[in-house]
């Protein structure tokens, strides 16, 4: 039988919501003392996932690929369809988050939901999540560095970007994001609030200027236009690859789950943060996608440019206004990386707390001054920088290494959802749950993750060369092989899954804050 953990609730006082959650009691029931401060309100929890998904950063980074893999038809209708499927994933994850609101999130819930081999399920989920998040931090920093260089090149035409400069700028960005995460979680919460408004106001500015300023817009029927410039003769295959644009954007919403131990009323606010961030991102992203699609003037010129969304801005708004829009995009990317690093450090903190990482005692320690896992922050920074370094010599090498980002995260998302489905009626939900819709939505989520994971690992351009080869399956295989060898060599004897520090009354006495 699987372990069943009820969600402790305080008695509701007169006039209050009957679901009043005692956050500390919930954490103690799961075997953990309180070491982090609860400064995240509902909006803050939503903000971190909304910032990591970051529709401005995601769409501007991948729009060009979509123009050649399906064109407007897949960019728009693919966005709608994939958004719905991702919302199913988020809803299924949210149900699990309500039952197990801990920083460990995916790996913790996998260990608790597994009937057998709890340690193994938890181990592989944790490492997929860790590697995916590290790759996300590195890739987002690299994208921001690339757009910063594009802005500088527009401002000073004599400037010629180099790979060395890109790596150095990326390193500076990640280190600065590490410094911001070193201070109190209250600062992180404030920055995430600013990020939400930066994204929303930035969206309004970009979309409104694209509506008002260009002399030419495409006709309404342009949304059905199809392009397949992937090099593959099959239009169906090319269109399927175009679905990746939306999937690449919708990652990182587990951030709300990872911030559970720092969120007030986490059993309700964390799942709401997950689902709301996906829902609002889907709507705002569709608006931005339509604005960009209808502002394309010369399709061939834009699709063939090095940065198609930037070319759309230049063609439609003029160079001066385009540079202002580019600053909005750069800001969005910087906020995205900051939030991603925050989520990453909480996963490291929790994974180390359960003894899964080398030097675990070091990484799950909390600063007595800021009440944040400072050492975990700098481990995340160091690992992200290590992934960036190969870009000094080869952009292809960097792309190959970070290609595990999205597929690693989505596979980590699938594990606890699948285990919850396998548990059936034995699963005891928290106060936020899907009721009778839990199982059909969960199966749709697992099936879509399986299908999209295959897409992530298929060839994405033809002819297949060293530069165009999709290294995601190789990167994933390396992660799984290393994790498997490590598991059978030593880990299975020392790591049995999530650790309980004692009875609720015992762990309550260990609270540090």
Locate predicted features.
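Transmembrane helix-loop boundary segments of multi-pass membrane transporters
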Residues: 65-76, 143, 152-164, 185-196, ...
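Terminal cytosolic tails of multi-pass membrane transporters
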Residues: 1-42, 417-441, 459-513
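TM-loop-TM module centered on a large, flexible mid-protein loop between adjacent transmembrane helices
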Residues: 108-115, 150-155, 227-229, 273-340, ...
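Helix-loop-helix junctions that connect adjacent transmembrane segments
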Residues: 31, 76, 155-165, 194-323
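Membrane-interface loop-to-helix entry segments
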Residues: 165-220, 251, 274-278, 402-415, ...
